[in-house]
Amino acid sequence: MTRSAEVQVPEIFRRENDETYADNLLRDYFRNFDGHLFDSLGHERNLEVDSGRVTSEDLLAVQMLSVKVPARAVKRILEDEAEIIEALLGGAPGPETPIWEVDEAQLTDAVEPLSCLWNLLRRNAGAPLRYDGKQSKVTGERDGMGPTLVSKLMARKRPGLIPISDGVVTTALGLPRSGKGHWLRARALMLEDVTYEGKRMPLHERLEKAVEKAEPRVPITPLRALDIILWYVNNPAPSTADLRAKVSGTW
């Protein structure tokens, strides 16, 4: 495992005088937002027997994050390209693998399973496609699977590996709304040290402690916790801001 150059940890994780605010936001999210169902819907099936394929339950789960897979894409994912998707998921790191334990090449190399899956789901025509010893290229026209939607579907299948490239989160991280560079940025952030409860620790350990305190219905990964906290603290929507204002702590 190699480590990226140092990156700036978001301010909410550097506020030693108010370090519980991030924990409180995470806990409040699971009380007030339907997004908690993205993680809990069919949780055990998703990470065990169905970890190597995309199911109709996965497509329903992403709707809990305010997106919908277009009908033409549903058919492609569940039928037309299902075998290719299964082969790519089978070649990718498993559902329990955290992003900080994989090498950068597994996240950036165009012929690695995760990159191939991203390009296939996005319909990035001409991108290399390698699976089961076969090598071809992605073909076909775009069918509504944008970067945010694809990131949510891939995060559902690999919650410890793929961050959700929501515009609020990518903007907060100084990245383009397309999410380009998000995987490497998230990996680097997880390895950065922060101070929490008087101790220095990697951000992923600090987020694990936040998850323990939040007591979600099902366990979530540190990467998912990072997505939630950054989304909640930076979301400008009035309804979200109103809920955020009721969370103990200051911002």
Model regions and ranges:
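Internal, hydrophobic cores of structured domains that mediate oligomerization or house catalytic pockets
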Residues: 151-156
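An N-terminal alpha-helical hairpin/helix-loop-helix interaction module that forms a charged
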Residues: 1-141, 160-251
